[in-house]
């Protein structure tokens, strides 16, 4: 294994800490979360809310890497007008390149996102994280971010995650 390539990949992954979430920037959120903070939020939700029939370890791995490709392609949102198939192709190419030189193959985790029971659960937690963050920013900064909550609700099945995303009132902070 080439340590120079491994070091480069490890350092590049750390830049997720500096990449702000594009949707929050577009809406004028002050000090918006980074993509890395979002990924942590999704992993936190997976850890805490994982049902017994879901492999928690697999789901956590998927949550950690689910937005890694954004290092290279950026945080593409529906407002950017990028065709979903084009976005997926860009992200797959970026992830494949980022996977090179690592001592572990991360490709199965990115391929599982949305496509396995664990991947679908992580995708649901991704939507829940967005809704909860919208509630938080709305409460703290007085912003109208209902579109993010509505977007999450449109993709969440009835049950606990949907109830949490709907949030009857702003959370106490």
Question: Where are the regions a protein language model picked out?
Answer:
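Active-site helical microenvironments for divalent-metal-assisted chemistry
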Residues: 1-173
């Amino acid at each position: 294994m080439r340590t120079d390539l491994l070091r480069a990949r490890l350092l590049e992954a750390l830049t997720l800490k500096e990449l702000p979430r594009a949707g929050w920037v577009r809406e004028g959120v002050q000090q918006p979360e980074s993509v890395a903070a979002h990924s942590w939020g999704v992993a936190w939700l997976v850890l805490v809310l994982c049902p017994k029939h879901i492999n928690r370890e697999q789901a956590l791995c998927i949550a950690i890497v689910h937005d890694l490709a954004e290092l290279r392609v950026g945080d593409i949102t529906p407002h950017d007008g990028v065709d979903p198939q084009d976005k997926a192709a860009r992200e797959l190419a970026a992830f494949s390149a980022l996977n090179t030189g690592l001592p572990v193959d991360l490709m199965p985790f990115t391929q599982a996102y949305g496509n396995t029971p664990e991947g679908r659960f992580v995708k649901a937690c991704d939507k829940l994280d967005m809704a909860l963050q919208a509630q938080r920013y709305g409460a703290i900064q007085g912003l109208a971010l209902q579109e993010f909550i509505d977007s999450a609700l449109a993709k969440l099945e009835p049950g606990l995650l949907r109830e949490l995303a709907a949030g009857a009132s702003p959370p106490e902070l």
